[in-house]
């Protein structure tokens, strides 16, 4: 017997206990057959929700079980974009579609080859953040179909040359924070990552391997 909790990501939700009681009742009627109730968030509600097996889904990627609360797991997803070009801006200029951001003084803008066609949500326009090393670089202007623009004025020029990588999700910028900036949930961020990204799998019995995107 298998079921799913409606409020597992809210530990205090009263429906969790009521659903558990109903599940126990059904299981008794089915002569103690194999039982599974807990998804990723429900695993953390306690052993009474575990039964014979659990269904970790997004937890396999280190996403926190309760939005807005400290994450007990290590994040295992890292999303990087490659810098395509860097332009010096010497006079006031606008950036991107709709001219929604203006660079007022001398600065540098990096164009990164990631966009909403890759699942980097357009709602991150003028809100997203990348990291070069441990230094944040703000996303400026709108997210385009295939490109984003980052203000890299604070980064030494030799660290943000074309071909260098920027962390869009990583140790300094976890999925939960990206989701909050985008006004959504981590599930949407992860499931939306497009086929054009190259997947690299690190660790495990197979060591390191890569899978090319379309």
What are these regions (language model features)?
Residues 88-214:
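C-terminal accessory subdomain/extension
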Residues 2-82, 86-90, 156:
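Active-site loop/helix belt of alpha/beta enzymes
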């Amino acid at each position: 017997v298998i079921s799913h909790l409606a409020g597992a990501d809210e530990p205090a939700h009263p429906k969790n206990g009521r659903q558990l009681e109903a599940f126990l009742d059904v299981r008794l009627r089915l002569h103690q057959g194999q039982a599974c109730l807990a998804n990723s968030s429900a695993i953390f509600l306690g052993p009474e929700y575990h039964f014979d097996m659990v269904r970790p889904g997004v937890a396999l990627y280190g996403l926190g079980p309760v939005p807005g609360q400290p994450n007990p797991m290590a994040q295992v997803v890292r999303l990087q974009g490659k810098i395509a070009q860097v332009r010096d801006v010497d006079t006031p200029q606008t950036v991107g579609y709709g001219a929604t951001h203006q660079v007022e003084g001398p600065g540098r803008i990096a164009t990164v080859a990631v966009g909403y066609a890759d699942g980097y949500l357009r709602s991150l326009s003028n809100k997203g953040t990348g990291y070069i090393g441990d230094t944040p670089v703000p996303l400026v202007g709108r997210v385009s179909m295939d490109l984003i623009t980052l203000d890299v004025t604070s980064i030494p020029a030799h660290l943000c040359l074309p071909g260098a990588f920027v962390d869009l999700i990583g140790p300094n910028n976890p999925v939960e924070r990206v989701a909050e900036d985008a006004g959504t949930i981590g599930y949407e961020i992860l499931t939306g990552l497009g086929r054009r990204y190259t997947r690299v799998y690190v660790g495990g019995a197979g060591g390191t391997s890569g899978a090319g995107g379309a």
